Each structure stands twice: as C-alpha cells, then as structure tokens.
Amino acid sequence: MNKIKNGWLSQIRKVISPHFDERPDVEDISLLVIHYISLPPEQFGGGYVDDFFQGKLDPTIHPYFEEIYQFRVSAHCLIERDGKVTQYVSFNDRAWHAGLSCFEGRDKCNDFAIGIELEGSNEQPFTAEQYQVLAALTRDIMQAYPKITLDRIVGHCDISPGRKIDPGQYFEWERYLALVKKGLDKK
C-alpha cells in the first residue's frame, strides 16, 4: 500500500508538472478517470511523457511532437508498461487531463477528478504489471478520497464521448475491477 499524504504518493517517482491549478474544492474529489498515452504514438519509453507534462517536449524530435508540443496538459500519475509509477500533480490539485468533459450532467471533470494515464495505445493490450499497479493505486486513492467508489471510475471516453476513445478497446475493465475488488476485500 502506498500512503497518500497531502495529495502525494509516498515512495514513488515525482516529476512536477507546471500544468495544474487549485481545485475549487478538495473535498469534492469524487471521480477517477483512466486514460492512455504513448509518445510518439504507438511507441513506449523515451521519457517523452515527462517532457510533455512539463511543457518541455522538443518539437524537432518527431513530426507528431510539432502538433502537440504547445499543449498544456498533465495527469496526476502515469503507469508505464513495466508498472513504474510517476506522479506529476498532487491529487489535491487540478491536473489538466479531462478537457471538455461531463459526468452525470456535471461539466469540467478536472474540477473533481483524478486522472491516471497508462502508457499504452488503442492498438495493443496493457501489461499485467499495469493492471496490478493500477488496481493497487486505485485502492489507495479510494481510501484517501472515499467519494471515489467503483461506480465512479470511468474511462476518458465516458466523460468525453465522440472526442476521446481511451483507455481503448484493449482495456479489460472486468479484469481491472476484479483486481480492485480483490484488494478491497482484504482490507
């Protein structure tokens, strides 16, 4: 179990993103949004997600980077293919991950959501390590933010339909939720 103190996970890598601001109400954190990211598309590793979330992406490295390097986005955490977690923004702050979004009639999901990126794509399955780590991280988040319940865990596609497709066709919701529940039963 990873302790969360003042919105930060203990014992994991931190790379601070400047792309965040204060939440309107920390007590309102009540949604977990699952995303995927790969930079360049369909490629893993390389540290480009760190650069992107810090506003330091070099547009000369890859043609796709020319399109996105000026975007100001972040997520709270990234889970890499090997299960390594990096935190970019305190859970108590508003990361800029959801964009135009709506959940149960409420707009601006960044105001009340935590965003977790999985290193991945819509073209291949996620790893066993990612499912294990995501489930454990989810349980830690649920313990620290009890308004996040199993029915308030969604994909980016669910809050931005027609605009986003992540976590994509290969994300195994049943597998992930079973792992989350299995760990909750032990507590």
Where are these regions (language model features)?
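N-terminal catalytic cores of peptidoglycan-degrading enzymes
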Residues: M1-D107
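Basic/polar, cationic surfaces and motifs that engage anionic cell-wall
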Residues: M1-Q11, D107-F112, S121-K187
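Conserved, mostly hydrophobic/aromatic
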Residues: I34, I116, L134
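Residues immediately flanking
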Residues: Y36, L118, C157
